[in-house]
């Protein structure tokens, strides 16, 4: 265990040292399982300002096929967790619940690899058969970096929700959507520039 922590700290130090150069790194993607759920909990604690309740992790068991862990040098440095939902106007949607990257590894193309994975997954035959029509997520209105990031992947701002978040300032969020599998966006697009 001590050896693993030394390896993690060495890799984090390397990540911080290389971050200024922003060299792109390649993730090894792995499945989320009940056995490695504890690693995801630790990653989320390190990367998010809110603490996810145990129920969040219990619910993830239903959505393992839409979650991926990202490893660099055998250390968990990022993840994406999505769930499949019914849409009110028919078909299904994939909701991005969390996308996380450890701070020393940000701006290294890792989040892009995770988002590209879910975009590819949404276009798979299995998801087409499930009638997946869009991917969507919530982004805090002050998070200009995230807004610009998702727009690069074709997401559009379709709604602003006031007081969405609790114990975070500002509490408001935008809903970002991206149509999938030949479907059109069924929501009005708001003109929000990050």
Briefly describe each language-model feature range.
Residues 115, 143-146, 163-168:
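Short glycine/proline-centered loop/turn elements that form peptide/ligand docking sites
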Residues 112:
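Residues forming the Rossmann-fold NAD(P)(H) cofactor-binding site
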Residues 1, 169-179, 185-189:
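C-terminal interaction modules of eukaryotic adaptor/scaffold proteins
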Residues 136-138, 151-175:
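Conserved catalytic-core motifs of GNAT/GCN5-like acyltransferases
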Residues 109:
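Conserved G/P- and acidic residue-centered "switch" motifs that form tight phosphate/ATP-binding loops
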């Amino acid at each position: 265990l001590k050896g693993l922590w030394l390896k993690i700290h060495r890799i984090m130090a390397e990540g911080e040292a290389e971050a200024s150069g922003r060299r792109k790194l390649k993730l090894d993607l792995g499945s989320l399982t009940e056995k490695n759920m504890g690693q995801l909990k630790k990653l989320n604690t390190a990367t998010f300002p809110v603490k996810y309740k145990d129920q969040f992790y219990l619910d993830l068991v239903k959505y393992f096929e839409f979650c991926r862990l990202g490893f660099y040098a055998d250390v968990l440095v990022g993840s994406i967790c999505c769930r499949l939902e019914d849409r009110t106007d028919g078909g299904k949607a994939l909701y991005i619940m969390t996308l996380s990257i450890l701070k020393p590894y940000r701006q290294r193309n890792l989040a892009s690899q995770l988002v590209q994975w879910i975009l590819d997954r949404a276009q798979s035959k299995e998801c087409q058969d499930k009638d997946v029509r869009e991917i969507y997520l919530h982004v805090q209105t002050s998070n200009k970096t995230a807004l610009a990031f998702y727009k690069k992947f074709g997401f559009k701002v379709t709604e602003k929700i006031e007081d969405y978040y609790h114990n975070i300032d500002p509490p408001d969020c935008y809903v970002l959507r991206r149509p999938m599998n030949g479907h059109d966006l069924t929501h009005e697009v708001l003109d929000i520039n990050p």
